[in-house]
A protein has these predicted regions:
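Positively charged n-region of N-terminal signal peptides that target proteins for export
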Residues: 1-5
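Bacterial N-terminal signal peptides
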Residues: 7-15
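Zymogen propeptides
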Residues: 17-114
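Short acidic-glycine loop/turn motifs at beta-strand connectors
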Residues: 42-45, 89, 124-129, 157-158, ...
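Short, solvent-exposed aromatic-acidic interface loops
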Residues: 53-58, 136-141, 191-194
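Active-site-adjacent helix-turn-beta-strand microarchitecture at beta-sheet edges
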Residues: 91-165
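Conserved, well-ordered active-site substructure
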Residues: 93-111, 164-212, 221-245
Length: 245
């Protein structure tokens, strides 16, 4: 039987050029007897966005309100996660930049709580890719950013775990954070069972291949994933990071 040239070329292309990986890939991951959900975002294909308030100026406080707002603009939420700590009025603690506009300034203050467990840091995205910098180092840069959120503590700096973390710590919480695989690949993770800071840092370093990672929050940690059919609605949220289509 004669095979057309087109069919032969099509078969060859399917063998030699496999389907492109999804731009947002969420999956379960078991690491050191703990379960995590990990979402990787390819910035060459998708754009990360930060959300805080709707067009009327009201804080979203969660994924459902964000979804409704986006739907009114003809957009759909693919993935989202809480993206930093906030004050009682849901305003960000520290730097918050969305759409290139600074909503809240960088904080170099000292204080109580995880945000001030220094070194803390900033996750940011520019035209050339994503990065995480310790707060004082970020303060020295002057290039524009598309988005940025400040939080703390840093989980990893140049592959080194935060010096105040204790491997055997009994401070166990649901936690979420963000790490840099490469300037064009960002990984966000949430623990599906309580973990300590040290365990969470090991996840980013040893399982996800990050050298820089930043803690986003704990206890309120929440995930929305269209692919996984997951929509956490645990507690009110402040800043939210996500991908839309």
């Amino acid at each position: 039987m004669r095979v057309s040239l087109f069919a032969a070329l099509l078969a060859f292309s399917l063998i030699c050029w496999p389907a492109r990986a999804p731009a947002v890939e969420c999956r379960a991951l078991d690491f050191h007897d703990k379960r995590y959900t990990v979402c990787e975002v390819d910035l060459t294909q998708e754009k990360l966005r930060l959300f805080l308030r709707d067009v009327a100026g009201n804080p979203f406080k969660g994924f459902d309100a964000l979804k409704r707002s986006l739907a009114g603009q003809g957009e759909h939420l693919l993935f989202a996660m809480n993206a930093g700590m906030y004050h009682p009025d849901y305003s960000p603690v520290g730097l918050f930049v969305t759409g290139g506009e600074e909503i809240s300034p960088l904080s170099t203050a000292s204080g109580e709580g995880n945000f001030f467990l220094k070194p803390n840091g900033v996750f940011f995205v520019t035209q050339s890719g994503a990065g995480i910098l310790e707060t004082s180092r970020y303060a020295q840069r002057h290039q524009p950013v598309l988005l940025a959120t400040q939080s703390g503590p840093m989980l990893l700096q140049n592959g080194e775990i935060h010096p105040r973390f204790i491997a055997a710590s009994d401070s166990l919480r649901t936690r979420n954070g963000v790490g840099i695989v490469s300037p064009q690949r960002v990984v966000l993770a949430i623990s599906d069972s309580p973990v300590n800071f040290y365990e969470f840092s090991l996840l980013f370093r040893d399982a996800l291949g990050c050298k820089e990672a930043l803690y986003l929050d704990g206890s309120i940690s929440s995930l929305y994933s269209l692919k996984l059919e997951r929509n956490d609605n645990l507690k009110p949220l402040g800043p939210i990071i996500g991908v839309t289509r």
